[in-house]
């Protein structure tokens, strides 16, 4: 199994405030699953972090595998934007994360399912 972790989950894990998510994170970490993140999530978390949180974020990302955003992912994200931007308000960041999940055949772990109306996306529960 491959799981791509969305920014909202990474925020919860890094701050440790949601016991349910942290417990699920620990179970996932102890499993054989490949756990991925997108560079989009790095940008989102870094932009909202305080300097005192930088080391913890670096350590969090070191424990995971970064999935690249290549040309194919860019085209897929563009297709998602064309299809869902007006009808569902999908933004560039979410389109890129969705394209990365689809391209890696990864389940997406997010609490913001409404941001991902794409039929190709399967969710991690």
Model-inferred region functions:
Residues 1-37, 46-62:
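Short, well-structured N-terminal submotif of metal-dependent ribonuclease cores
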Residues 10-11, 42-45, 74, 116:
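A generic structural signal for short hydrophobic patches within well-formed alpha-helices
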